[in-house]
C-alpha cells in the first residue's frame, strides 16, 4: 500500500523584478544533521488473513553536489511480525519485508535514523559529449523504456530530437530538455495518470509526471536517467541575491525526482520541477529504479482476505524531522537566458547555448470608458481550480489494487505536497 504524495514548493519573492528568464545560478552550501522518524499505523479490516509491510533502508550516497550519510537506522514493529526478511533487489535497494499471519487488530512500524546531508554548489566542469555512446553495463538499464517512461513513443522521440538538434554536449542536451519541462509542464495533483505520455499530452501532472517525462525525453536520446523516491522536509531555507531573498519551502512527505548519469560526473540529482544538477539537503533519498512502478517497496502494504470480505486496511503515516544542526549559506544571480519559469542550477563550465527568453509585450493601454466595461459585477472563481477536494491528508494512500485472488496492495502517494 503505497502511493506517492509529491511535495509542492512554496516560493516567496521578497522583491519586485521584471518578467523574463527565471534561471538562477546558485553558489554556496547547506549542511545539516537530521533526526528522522516515520511511523505507520495499520488497522486491519474484517476478514483480513495476512498483512505484509515493506520498507527500504535509506542508503548513504554521494554525488558532485549532494551527499547523504545515514547513521543508526532502526525499524521496530509492534507487535512483532511472524516473519521478517531483508534482501537486496537488482537496483541495490535494501528491502525489509515483515509478515503477520494471523493479523492483529493494529500494527505499528517505527523507522528512525540520523541523516547528515550536505549540498555543495561550486563550479562544476563537464565535457561529456553528446551523443554519449556506450555506457557501463550497470548504467544501461536506465536507458530502457517502460510503461511509465515511454521513451520509445514516436511523439516523445520527436520532441527529444527537436530539443537536442545540433547539440554537442550532454549538459546542453539536458539543459534544453529541462528548460522545456519547467516551461511547459504545469503542476496539478492528483493527475489522471502518472506516466510521461500523459504529461506530454496534458501538459500537467505531479512530481511523478515531471520525473517520468524528463526521464523519457532524456532516455529517448540515450541519456541514462533513474527515478528516485524519497521524502522532502518542510524546513524553509533562503537564497540571498542582490535586492532581496528567495525563500524555499517544501511540504513534508513523499516525493519523486531523478538522477542523470554523466560520463565524467557519475549520477547527479535533479528535481525537474525546479533544480538542475542538485537537490537541497532537505531531501532524504530512499529508493531508486527505472520508474515509479518499480520503486514501490518503501511503505508498501499488501494483504489477503477471506473471499467476499469488504473493506480494506486503514493506514496512517506521520513523518517528523528534528534538525540538530543546520547551516545554509546560498546566494543566487538571475541570468538573462531561459527558462521563463524558475530553475536553479550551480555554476557549470561546459559548452552550451543560452536559450533566449523574449520579454512579454507591454500591456495595452486601456481608457477609462473601456475600463468601466471590464469591471466584474458577478462573482467569479480564480486561483488553482484543480486543487483536490475532500482529501484526507492524514491518510495519504492510494486506492487498493488487486494483485491476485483475494490479494491486494496499496502504495504510497504524493498528495502531502499539495497540502503545503
Give residue spans per PLM region:
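Positively charged n-region of N-terminal signal peptides that target proteins for export
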Residues: 1-4
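Bacterial N-terminal signal peptides
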Residues: 6-16
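A short, structured loop/turn motif at beta-sheet edges
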Residues: 46-48, 102-107, 168, 219-224, ...
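A mature extracytoplasmic/lumenal domain signature
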Residues: 57-59, 113-117, 128, 229-231, ...
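Secondary-structure boundary elements
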Residues: 107-206, 213-216, 220-221
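Hydrophobic/aromatic-rich core segments of domains that either
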Residues: 212-312
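Low-complexity, Gly/Ser/Thr/Pro-rich intrinsically disordered linker/tail segments
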Residues: 281-417
